[in-house]
A protein has these predicted regions:
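Helical mechanochemical/support elements of P-loop NTPase systems and associated helical scaffolds
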Residues: 4, 16-19, 44, 65, ...
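Phosphate-binding/switch region of NTP-binding enzymes
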Residues: 110-113, 117-192
Length: 192
């Protein structure tokens, strides 16, 4: 949701990056603009294109530290002109103290709430201690888990993922959604 934080948690090959790219592509529809803050340095432009991301309408930022990442995000939220800011924290190895990250997240909260921008944080499971404070500011928290590979004859054509809604401030209670992610740019499932 706009003006709020959504957190996606998963492990490599869980489908989280594919879903994130699909969310960016959706946000870019109707002239929306998105920013990908790539602290982990793992953004793959070719894969993003296959997921529908329009690179000419995506600003890619590669900060070096958590502090730079959150300062950039705060500045973007203050501008209030973006549809989506995605913060890819999957492989970050910064040693910023959890208390300092909590302070920076507090400074993000107000400008984000006043903006029309959605914030999407991508984090590995299990979470690193620095990001425990993020849970306080998160409106929606999703756990992404790959269930099985999908085959077409002998070839792997995709995978089935389970999205578990761990937290949703507007609709309490854990929920599960199954999605099929295929390598031909299609995402099908009961979560549409």
């Amino acid at each position: 949701p706009r003006g709020r934080i959504t957190q996606m948690i998963g492990i490599p090959t869980s489908g989280m990056t594919t879903l994130a790219h699909k969310i960016i592509a959706n946000a870019q529809g109707g002239q929306g603009a998105a920013v990908y803050i790539d602290l982990s340095g793992t953004f793959d432009p070719d894969y993003a294109i296959r997921c529908g991301v329009m690179l000419d309408r995506l600003l890619l930022v590669r900060p070096k530290t958590i502090t730079q990442t959150l300062d950039i995000a705060r500045d973007l939220f203050n501008e209030g002109k973006l549809t989506l800011v995605l913060l890819d924290l999957l492989n970050e190895r910064d040693t910023t103290r959890p208390r300092d990250v909590g302070t920076m997240l507090r400074k993000l909260h107000e400008p984000l709430a006043k903006s029309r921008t959605a914030a999407l944080f991508l984090l590995n499971a299990p979470q690193r201690p620095q990001w425990q404070a993020l849970e306080e500011y998160t409106d929606i928290r999703l756990l992404i888990q790959r269930q099985t590979w999908l085959y077409q004859e002998r070839d792997i054509r995709g995978y089935r993922v389970q999205v578990t809604i761990l937290k949703d401030k507007s609709s309490p209670g854990e929920k599960h959604i199954i999605l099929d992610l295929t390598f031909d740019d299609a995402v099908k499932g009961n979560g549409a």
